[in-house]
């Protein structure tokens, strides 16, 4: 560790010969280099503090030489005297040298204990740095700690401000005044049901409660019912209309063909189709097992009946 000594005799500055700025700069550079090599074993915080003090001392030396002062503030040669000697003008720097280093070490130790303070927060004081107060600002379980505040404050309705993700489970105890968020489809369905209930109440009609499936037969019947592409139940009237339109379109397409091999035979007329054959065609299309296999047989049968 580098040791600094102070010479109290005022004749020390007068006894040393004055040198030019080049020699003084080289001596200060060599001294700082030797000090850096000697203080490598010290912690990084002490090394940085000594470097700052050395830079301040060298800058003060250069200003005193330019102003032409009577006394020369310079470091002694390290090789000649064994240790650096500082003039009386730098006594203030030597006395206060330990205080900045101690303050710097305190700030380093407090910054290294940020993780402990976050778990067990210590009482705030004026010595805590500004960065530590900013490090405590975070969001924990619906509580937001604003900047420069010692205690976190609760902010309601964080979902409205977008601070909480959309997929949040509902709380166990829901208050009556708290809103429940739904999508657009559910919102319109709720409004539609409310309007219907208000209309029935205005007409003094009995509002029937919607009963769930309490019996197994209702569930089995729902499984047997035909469903569309979206999983909805298909109406029976729509099924009959679709089958009738399909049968009529197939019959209309069959009128364009002639059964004679030479092309001179009579075509299939609309009068040749009887109501019984039409009903048979509907029944054939309603049955999925004979939907494709039954069509050629009915077509040939109607053609033979019209030919005879």
Swiss-Prot record:
Compositionally biased residues, Polar residues: 11-26
An example Gene Ontology molecular-function term: transcription cis-regulatory region binding
Positions with biased composition (Basic and acidic residues): 1-10
GO cellular component: CCAAT-binding factor complex
Region (Disordered): 1-26, 49-71, 251-273
SMART domains listed in its UniProt record: CBF
DNA-binding positions: 211-236
Disruption phenotype: Altered response to blue light (BL) and abscisic acid (ABA).
Predominant place of localization: nucleus
Zinc-finger is among the record's keywords: no
Cell compartments where the protein resides: Nucleus
Keywords assigned by UniProt, alphabetized: Abscisic acid signaling pathway, Activator, DNA-binding, Nucleus, Transcription, Transcription regulation
Record InterPro entries: CCAAT-binding_factor_CS, NFYA
Classification via Gene3D superfamilies: 6.10.250.2430
Residue ranges annotated as motif Subunit association domain (SAD): 181-204
GO annotation (BP), single: seed development
Tissues expressing the protein: Expressed in the whole plant, except roots. Present in etiolated seedlings.
Function: Stimulates the transcription of various genes by recognizing and binding to a CCAAT motif in promoters. Involved in the blue light (BL) and abscisic acid (ABA) signaling pathways.
Family in the record: Belongs to the NFYA/HAP2 subunit family.
Assembly description: Heterotrimeric transcription factor composed of three components, NF-YA, NF-YB and NF-YC. NF-YB and NF-YC must interact and dimerize for NF-YA association and DNA binding.
Protein name per the record: Nuclear transcription factor Y subunit A-5
Chain's gene name: NFYA5
């Amino acid at each position: 560790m580098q040791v600094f000594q102070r010479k109290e005799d005022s004749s020390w500055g007068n006894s040393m010969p004055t040198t030019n700025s080049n020699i003084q700069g080289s001596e200060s550079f060599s001294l700082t280099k030797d000090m850096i090599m000697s203080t490598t074993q010290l912690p990084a915080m002490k090394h940085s503090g000594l470097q700052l003090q050395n830079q301040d001392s060298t800058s003060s030396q250069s200003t005193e030489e330019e102003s032409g002062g009577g006394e020369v503030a310079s470091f002694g040669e390290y090789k000649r005297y064994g240790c650096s000697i500082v003039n009386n003008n730098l006594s203030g720097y030597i006395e206060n040298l330990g205080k900045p280093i101690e303050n710097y070490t305190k700030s380093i130790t407090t910054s290294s204990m940020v993780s402990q303070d976050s778990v067990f927060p210590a009482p705030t004081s004026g010595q805590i740095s500004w960065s530590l107060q900013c490090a405590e600002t975070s969001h924990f379980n619906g509580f937001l700690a604003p900047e420069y505040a010692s205690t976190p404050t609760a902010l309601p309705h964080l979902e409205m401000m977008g601070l909480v993700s959309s997929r949040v489970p509902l709380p166990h105890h829901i208050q009556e005044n708290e809103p429940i968020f739904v999508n657009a489809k559910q919102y319109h369905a709720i409004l539609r049901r409310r309007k219907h209930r208000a209309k029935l109440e205005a007409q003094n009609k009995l509002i029937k409660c919607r009963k769930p499936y309490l019996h197994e037969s209702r569930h089995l019947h729902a499984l047997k019912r035909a469903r569309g592409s979206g999983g909805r139940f298909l109406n029976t009237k729509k099924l009959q209309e679709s089958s009738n339109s399909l049968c009529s379109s197939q019959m209309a397409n069959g009128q364009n063909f002639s059964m004679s091999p030479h092309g001179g035979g009579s075509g299939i007329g609309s009068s040749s189709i009887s109501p019984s054959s039409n009903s048979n065609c509907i029944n054939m299309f309603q049955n999925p097992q004979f939907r494709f296999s039954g069509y050629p047989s009915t077509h040939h049968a109607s053609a033979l009946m019209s030919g005879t």
